[in-house]
């Protein structure tokens, strides 16, 4: 790929860890960029740091705590009980308004300073949680906007956009990091590593995908 450096938006969860190792396969130089946005499960950043060190990639953290104060959501506000299932006619209250918009915009500025013009994010439209900023149309639109804003040629890569959680597990296995992703990542909204709490939306999706993948792999 033209320009051999990439910045991975990295939370230390299943999706972004899979993307980190995908990026290592495709780029010579990889930066992992994490964000503190007021999330209740903020220790994910320290787990992310450890994974980045194991992967041998440069790790950075951005303080974006203002994001949590902009909109009401259950990931940053301890007074709000988390939706365990997606409401029929609205976003789940785990949606953090503007999160991916801010993360990708900040990542682009950071990347430009490193001379990197590839951004990698683990958003997916297939196992859709109802988050508008995970849609392919949003990513493509923002890619154009970032290029216009900085007169550069960024490329936003979304390796997981059109695959489901079972296929994401398969990709981790293909990349040789299945056990690392299963045992050392933090996907749980309640901040419990590996298999997590088992009942938040993120854990349910992760478990469902894992069981589906293992049932196919073990045939």
Curated annotation (Swiss-Prot):
Zn(2+) binds at residues 188, 197, 200, 203. One of its GO terms (molecular function) is zinc ion binding. Pfam families: QueC. Its cofactor is Zn(2+). Keywords: ATP-binding, Ligase, Metal-binding, Nucleotide-binding, Queuosine biosynthesis, Zinc. ATP binds at residues 10-20. Belongs to the QueC family. This is 7-cyano-7-deazaguanine synthase. It comes from Bacteroides fragilis (strain ATCC 25285 / DSM 2151 / CCUG 4856 / JCM 11019 / LMG 10263 / NCTC 9343 / Onslow / VPI 2553 / EN-2). The lineage of its organism: Bacteria, Pseudomonadati, Bacteroidota, Bacteroidia, Bacteroidales.
